[in-house]
Amino acid sequence: DKCPKGWLDFRGNCYGYFRYELPWKRAEAWCRSIRAGAHLASIHTSEEHRAIAKFISQYHHGEEEEDVWIGLFRWNSVWAWIDGSKKHYSALDDDDYPKGKHCAVLDESSGFLSWDNDSCGERNAFICKCTA
């Protein structure tokens, strides 16, 4: 299979960017509904991260700040990927986290090159990932 039209094709995976703003769980459900095996994106290398940041940045022209959900969430004080993949790479500032902010976003103010944690009920744009 090829990637759906308008999605990024990068090293055997497809990435779809959606600007509808949804809470994290609804964004994950949306990804799953689009294609079998799709989830909010997991990011495992700096190359993958840069490719995603560049892809999302094409849609941004200095408009209002719009952080983007990825598939990273905090469960029992451990960060994990919703697709079950192992966490090999992080762009989170691992210092200390305000309570109640258990889901991760690509931070728009960094050009999507750093991650931040946000309240999972906040509404953000999101990026889905599936295998090509």
Swiss-Prot record:
Localization: Secreted, Extracellular space, Extracellular matrix
Pfam families assigned: Lectin_C
One Gene Ontology term of the molecular function aspect: carbohydrate binding
Keywords: Disulfide bond, Extracellular matrix, Lectin, Secreted
Matches recorded under InterPro entries: C-type_lectin-like, C-type_lectin-like/link_sf, C-type_lectin/snaclec_domain, C-type_lectin_CS, CTDL_fold
Chief localization: secreted
One CC-aspect GO term: extracellular region
Disulfide-linked positions: 3-14, 31-128, 103-120
Domain C-type lectin: 10-129
PANTHER family given in the database record: MANNOSE, PHOSPHOLIPASE, LECTIN RECEPTOR RELATED
This protein's name: Struthiocalcin-1
Species whose genome carries this gene: Struthio camelus
Phylogenetic placement of the source organism: Eukaryota, Metazoa, Chordata, Craniata, Vertebrata
